[in-house]
Design a protein with these regions (language model features):
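Solvent-exposed, amphipathic alpha-helical segments
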Residues: 13, 17-24, 71, 75-78, ...
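Short, solvent-exposed amphipathic helices
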Residues: 123-130, 134
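N-terminal intrinsically disordered/low-complexity leader segments
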Residues: 1-9, 191-193
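Hydrophobic alpha-helical connector segments
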Residues: 59, 73-103, 150-153, 176
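Amphipathic alpha-helical segments used for helix-helix packing
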Residues: 98-122
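Helix-turn-helix
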Residues: 13, 17-55, 59
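Hydrophobic/aromatic-rich alpha-helical bundle segments in the mid-to-C-terminal region
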Residues: 120-125, 140-193
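Amphipathic alpha-helical linker/stalk segments
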Residues: 2-3, 16, 24, 60-88
Length: 193
């Protein structure tokens, strides 16, 4: 007989194990057995909760996006000006619990997954639309080149994540400063044209 209340805990353990396993191996070439072992359960139980490795990967992707969305909402709630709100979006992208090595490696792997799996592609599109929308909302109040700046900032954020996943020692404060400085430069240039 199954233990009451264990499913959410076991699902959470599996999601965390997916992120840890991908983060450690830096690859999607992990097995359900590896994930389950890391979570302290059998492969059969992992399959019971998710059905497939792909669904475990999607759940991990959703988890990372959910953490990120929660951080963005908190940052926006505390901001009072358009520039403060933009800074909040940038800060959320590079918060230490979001921009940690295992999650940046997992995130890079999810980009690869999104090329071939419709569910992952959909989640990636939702993330990209939300990021662009959050940037545009306040950029439109600050610059006539809001669309171009939003696209460039989104690409820069993705690029910083890509570089962080490919090398050791990436720091969230340095990444945040890099994107924030770029934003200031873009705003200054766009308002002097």
């Amino acid at each position: 007989m199954p233990k009451v209340g264990m499913e959410p805990k076991r699902r959470a353990a599996l999601v965390s194990a997916v992120i840890d396993e991908i983060g450690e191996t830096r690859s999607l070439d992990v097995t359900v057995a590896q994930i389950a072992r890391r979570a302290g359960m059998s492969s059969g139980l992992a399959h019971h909760y998710f059905g497939s490795k792909e669904q475990m990967l999607i759940a991990a992707m959703r988890h990372i996006l959910s953490e990120f969305s929660t951080k963005v909402r908190a940052e926006l709630r505390d901001a009072s000006t358009p520039r403060d709100r933009l800074e909040g979006v940038i800060r959320a992208n590079f918060a230490p619990h979001v921009f940690d090595p295992r999650k940046t490696s997992a995130w890079l792997s999810f980009y690869a997954l999104a090329q071939s799996k419709p569910d992952a592609a959909h989640l990636m599109q939702v993330y990209q639309r939300r990021l662009r929308s959050n940037l545009l909302f306040d950029l439109r109040k600050l610059s006539p080149q809001a669309d171009e700046i939003a696209d460039t900032l989104a690409a820069l954020i993705d690029g910083v994540y890509l570089r962080a996943a490919l090398r050791e020692g990436a720091r969230s404060d340095a990444a945040h400063l890099q994107v924030s400085t770029a934003l200031d430069t873009f705003l200054k240039q766009s308002n002097t044209r």
